[in-house]
Structure formats: structure tokens, C-alpha cells
């Protein structure tokens, strides 16, 4: 089993604070070896770069380790990266590596936190094949994923921080969901 996770905007390389909390929680719930792949991208505004890296890695895993169950996830900008990989059937806007047909059979679950794409609808609207395998979590009045009054963004910004998700038990909630899909 492998978790492929894209960190949030401006987080240091790796899976980020929330990614680490989610993976730790998942490890405590399953009796399996869990490897981790941190999506390699600058985590600034480069969604396409992250999506290409995630997609290339997933395709490589499907080809070279076809029995490995994959869990895809992301926080904030990383959730948008995951959205592109799962929902874009063709290359566009710098994303040039759509997943081939049948790849979905290797993806056990998807965990998204603070997903800005919620403004246009959940990922499952665009890629319904993942409906029963996806958990999308939005913490309270997080202005990134909860369409709220733009005048409240500054006051509500702390709701979007990784620590708020962790403190609210959402890393654990996602781990419970994913563990149930394995």
C-alpha cells in the first residue's frame, strides 16, 4: 500500500503537516506496510506541475507494482493537484499526463482536505467513479473550501490552517474512512 500525497501551498517539501498527521493516523489503523510518495512540486501555484508528477508516479506504480493499493490525497493546493489527476481525462493547461483507463482499479481511496475546488463542486461531480472511495473534508468556515462571504476570509483564515484540521480530528477521520476501503 502506498499513500501519494500533495502538500498544501507554501509548505516545505514532503507531505506537509496535515499529510504527516493523516499518514500517522492511517498507520495506526491498518496492519499493513505503508510507503509514502510526496508529490514533487513547488507548492506555490503550480497545480499542473504537481498533477503531472502525481500522475506519472501513479502510472509508474500501476506498471511496476500492480498489486500495490494506492491512496491519493492532498491538502489545499495539493487537493487541487489531486482533483486534476482524477478528473482531467485529457491534457490541458500544462497538465499533460492524464491517467489511462483502468488506473482507477488501483486507487483504493482518496482523501482531500481544504479543497478549493469545492467552489465548483466536489471532485465526485467530475469523476464519479471515485464517489464511494473519496472523503473531502472542509473545516468549519475554512474560506478555501466553504463558499463564505469574502468579507470574512481574514477572520476565517485560521480555519484553513493544517493545525485546525488536525485539532478537529479530521486527519483521524480521513484515516478511518481510508482504512475502511483497504
Name the predicted role of every residue range.
Residues 1-69, 141-180:
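Active-site catalytic motif of lipid deacylating hydrolases and related acyltransferases
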Residues 4, 37, 111, 133-138:
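Hydrophobic/aromatic beta-strand patches that form the interior of the parallel beta-sheet core
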Residues 52-135, 143-144:
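Serine-dependent carboxylesterase/thioesterase catalytic core
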